[in-house]
Amino acid sequence: MIDPQLLRKDIAAVAARLATRKFQLDVEKFNALESERKSLQTRTEELQAKRNQLSKAIGMKKGKGEGAAAEMAEVTQVNADMESGSSRLAVLQAEISDFLMGIPNLPDESVPASKDETENKEVKRWGEQPIFDFEVKDHVDLGGPLGLDFEVAAKISGSRFIVLKGPIARLHRALAQFMIDTHATEHQYQEVYAPYMVNAASMRGTGQLPKFEEDLFKVPRQMGGEDGNGEAKTENFYLIPTAEVPVTNLVRDEIVNTDNLPMKFVAHTPCFRSEAGSYGRDVRGMIRQHQFDKVELVQITKPEDSMQALEDLTGHAERILELLELPYRKVLLCTGDMGFGSTKTYDLEVWVPSQNAYREISSCSSMGDFQARRMQARFKVGQGKPELVHTLNGSGLAVGRALVALLENKQQVDGSIAIPKALQPYLGGLEVLKPI
């Protein structure tokens, strides 16, 4: 959530910055809400002053032994007016909060202002695209003999699911373990095991709710008892779309000692996405799934450190690609292509030979204080006033897409897969993964 004071001070400037994100700020609505809020607060202050005056007058009259029925009746009316105003103010504050919840983050000044992904800026390219002297297979054809099974997954769950067996399941597990170990030992992240289901407050904290509810898998749970309509009380849980949600929420409603910053976490979890709006896209293979594994990096920093932390975090994800000997490029997203909560984002795109294209394998973002304001995640220096932390996150990496890239870039003429040296210790020293 952006700072409401920015809107109150210069709403035109905020609207202009948001327009670069293809977001039209409803200036008229916000001004109307603010005008009523100010009027109500002024009226409440006036009523409070009047009640204080009446209370003094009542005290003086009673001290003189005089009656104060009229003043007491007036106090009763003032109290009723204050209660009515307080109720309306609470409703109004909720409306303002809902309004703010729907506004995306402001882009950092270093982000190029452009309309869509076609104008993202490539800032780095690493590795040589492999040249094959045989017909290149895609990961579906390569994976089948290694234990990749879409048919049985469709029988069990439906489309956009996979079953991995034998060699390919082992390779998938090895990739995740290699990523976690590298981040924990080389990059000093603390490993976290977190819930795969979270409550609505956690989803609101990181920005998935209320805007992106249709992209989530919701799990209602009966709580016992009935609501006001006689229906059974329920509470919604949500399957996590990324470990960013539970891990970032570790600091929700917390005041962190500045000596503990930065906080660096790594977590390996399954991720669950409905892929609403993705009908017809990447229908073949593992690129777009309802369930997939990801190793996620999260950092909690002081405001002045967050931009350098983004460079560092992105570099940590790049390190995995380089150790896996996978060609990739680093792209700075323009304002029109950034995620809802991001103030600056780098995408890492890995080379996929069968598609003759680079495909996203990691997205690394600084959220500034956007999530922290929603979560009330703060830090304090000594006895000073608490300030909002900055939060960052990035994939380090998406395990399934790393598997896709490894299969295709390291394929051999006989369908076997050459294992990068850094990954071999996680496969018992295996240098080549052969079909079953």
From Swiss-Prot:
Transmembrane segments: none annotated. It catalyses: tRNA(Ser) + L-serine + ATP = L-seryl-tRNA(Ser) + AMP + diphosphate + H(+); tRNA(Sec) + L-serine + ATP = L-seryl-tRNA(Sec) + AMP + diphosphate + H(+). It comes from the Bacteria. It holds the Pfam family tRNA-synt_2b. L-serine binds at T242, A243, E244, E296, S395. Keywords: Aminoacyl-tRNA synthetase, ATP-binding, Cytoplasm, Ligase, Nucleotide-binding, Protein biosynthesis. ATP binds at R273, S274, E275, E360, I361, S362, S363. GO terms for biological process: selenocysteine biosynthetic process; seryl-tRNA aminoacylation. GO terms for molecular function: ATP binding; serine-tRNA ligase activity. Its EC number is 6.1.1.11. Its main location: cytoplasm. Pathway: Aminoacyl-tRNA biosynthesis; selenocysteinyl-tRNA(Sec) biosynthesis; L-seryl-tRNA(Sec) from L-serine and tRNA(Sec): step 1/1. Belongs to the class-II aminoacyl-tRNA synthetase family. Type-1 seryl-tRNA synthetase subfamily. Consists of two distinct domains, a catalytic core and a N-terminal extension that is involved in tRNA binding. Homodimer. The tRNA molecule binds across the dimer. Catalyzes the attachment of serine to tRNA(Ser). Is also able to aminoacylate tRNA(Sec) with serine, to form the misacylated tRNA L-seryl-tRNA(Sec), which will be further converted into selenocysteinyl-tRNA(Sec). This is Serine--tRNA ligase. It comes from Polynucleobacter necessarius subsp. necessarius (strain STIR1). The lineage of its organism: Bacteria, Pseudomonadati, Pseudomonadota, Betaproteobacteria, Burkholderiales.
